């Protein structure tokens, strides 16, 4: 998603936000998906990719991989003005710094590659 406003504007990132009240990370993810792209029904499977604590130890970040059956046109909210379906190795730029760090991690790339290979095997 291309961020259109706020302090992190003009960068490409993922659906995201802060959990509200007593929300679990999973509940927060579902709510943020609905708020930012409009629909969770297209998601076949959701897999945790990574969790990490911010440098100041104030925030615990969770990143998930959501597998969809088919690409779709998201209903973007006012936070975003664009979206892209990308190949595994060709990401739009500039990336949000957190997403860039996630995608530079060899562990995360290995996890993503395994999931994509598994999906391709199952779909053939």
Task: Give the residues covered by each predicted segment.
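N-terminal strand-loop-strand
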Residues: 1-14
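Short aromatic-enriched loop/helix-cap "lid" or pocket-rim segments at secondary-structure transitions
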Residues: 12, 97-98
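The catalytic Nudix box helix
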Residues: 14-47
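A generic structural signal for short hydrophobic patches within well-formed alpha-helices
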Residues: 19, 91-94
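Active-site-adjacent beta-strand/loop module that shapes the phosphate/pyrophosphate-binding cleft
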Residues: 50-73, 79, 84-90, 106-108, ...
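A small-molecule sensor/coupling module
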Residues: 98, 104-109
């Amino acid at each position: 998603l291309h961020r259109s406003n706020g302090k992190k504007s003009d960068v490409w990132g993922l659906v995201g936000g802060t959990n509200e009240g007593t929300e679990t990370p999973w509940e927060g993810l579902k709510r943020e998906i609905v708020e930012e792209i409009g629909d969770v029904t297209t998601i076949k499977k959701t897999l945790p990719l990574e969790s990490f604590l911010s440098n100041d130890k104030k925030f615990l970040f969770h990143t998930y991989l959501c597998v969809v059956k088919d690409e779709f046109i998201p209903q973007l909210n006012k936070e975003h003005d664009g979206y892209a379906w990308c190949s595994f190795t060709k990401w739009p730029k500039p990336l949000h710094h957190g997403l860039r760090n996630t995608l530079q991690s060899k562990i995360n790339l290995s996890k993503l590659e395994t999931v994509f290979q598994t999906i391709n095997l199952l779909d053939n």
